Structure formats: C-alpha cells, structure tokens
Swiss-Prot record:
Enzyme class: transferase
Single GO MF descriptor: arginyl-tRNA--protein transferase activity
GO cellular component, one term: cytoplasm
Disulfide-bond pairs as recorded: none
Protein name: Aspartate/glutamate leucyltransferase
Keywords tagged on the record: Acyltransferase, Cytoplasm, Transferase
Superkingdom, natural source: Bacteria
Predominant location: cytoplasm
Catalytic activity: N-terminal L-glutamyl-[protein] + L-leucyl-tRNA(Leu) = N-terminal L-leucyl-L-glutamyl-[protein] + tRNA(Leu) + H(+); N-terminal L-aspartyl-[protein] + L-leucyl-tRNA(Leu) = N-terminal L-leucyl-L-aspartyl-[protein] + tRNA(Leu) + H(+)
Lineage of source species: Bacteria, Pseudomonadati, Pseudomonadota, Gammaproteobacteria, Pseudomonadales
Localization annotation: Cytoplasm
Amino acid sequence: MTELARLKFYATQPHSCSYLPEEQATTLFLDPSQPMDVHVYADLSEMGFRRSGDHLYRPHCQNCNACVPARIPAARFIPNRQQRRILKRNADLTVTAARPAFKEEYFELYRRYIETRHADGDMYPPSRDQFSTFLVRDLPFCWFYEFRLEGRLMAVAVCDLLPNGLSAVYTFYEPDEERRSLGRFAILWQITEALRQNLEAVYLGYWIKNCKKMNYKTQYRPIELLINQRWVTLN
C-alpha cells in the first residue's frame, strides 16, 4: 500500500445530495495539488474513492452511509440468462480504445444521452465545457472505449485502467437503441476486458439501496460491497 498517511484530504461543506434529495452530503477530496499517481489512485479505490475530472473523492457524510462502494470480481463473475442475451444481442459491435479527446461525435452522443435519460439530474443541460471538464482529461490511465456498429458510434465507456482493476468512470450511449441495453453491455464488456488484462475487478462506483437508478449494479453477481472498511461478497 502507498503511504496514504502522507496525503492531505479536504472535506466540502454540506450540500444537497445528488442521489437522495432529502439528504445533505459531504464529500472528501484528495488534495488537488497532489499529482494524480496511478498507484495512489489504485490504493484509494480500495478505500472507496472515485475519480471525477481531475479529482479523487468519496462520500464523507456525518449522518448517512447510504453510498456503498461496489466492485465486480472479474474472475468469479457468472452472467445470468438476461446478461447472456445482452451479450449475444450486441455481438455485432466492435470496440476500440481511444485516448481522451473532445470530438463533436462524442459530444453529440453525450448530449442526446443526457437529454433523454438524465434530464432530471444535475448534469442537465449538457454543455461542451461540462463534457470536457468531466470526461476529457489528459491522464495516462484513462481510456475512451468506443462501441460501434458498422462505423456508427453507439456508446462510449470512459474507464481508468488501474493496477488493481478497471474503474468505470462513466458510460454514455445511443438512447434510441434501448433494446440493446447498451449500458449493461458496456459493463459486461468491461468485465471481459478486465479478465483479458488479468485485472482483479471492475469498480462500479457507489450503490445506493434506495436509489432506483443504482439498482442495476447488484444484478452482477457476485458483487463486492465495501462495508465497515471491508469488501464483503454478495452472491
């Protein structure tokens, strides 16, 4: 483990929670002057930290522990019948790794996705500046995985390639292709990619029991949840 005791962290003032509107949230950030070292990042991911733009963070709420870090142990994952159907349905897609960059093709897909699927969220309305600040970061471990159908961009999975796993930062996809379940397929593909690269896990971010938008995460079994500073398996 990295000497994490040397690192500095800062907590925000209480603010409205993005997931549970009736709650006040506090967020703990790694000192932004600390270089974004991949090994520090990997160690912090084991402790439930995530990346957004140039920042590593985790929830640090005084009276709530609803945000539970979740990861899929790649070698032990077994797809269920529905997931096997999703894999088969998307077997015609090709996946290519690209460096993070701003492209109108990316932004137009992102814009349609946010406007269709998340018009009630804090990422609406989408803008080019927001897209760039959130996702287009020049970090050596960050990759854009493009999912295409005969050249047409169907989805982009933004992932961080860490020594201990793939961290699923964000996925946006064609909202008109609902039958394909592209968001779920992107996770299934990332599990396969983690196995191919001999990585232990796919980090999914936070699972929140009372947030319907998070329910899909526990459909991947087994899944591991960080509870009381220990990763606990949910079969």
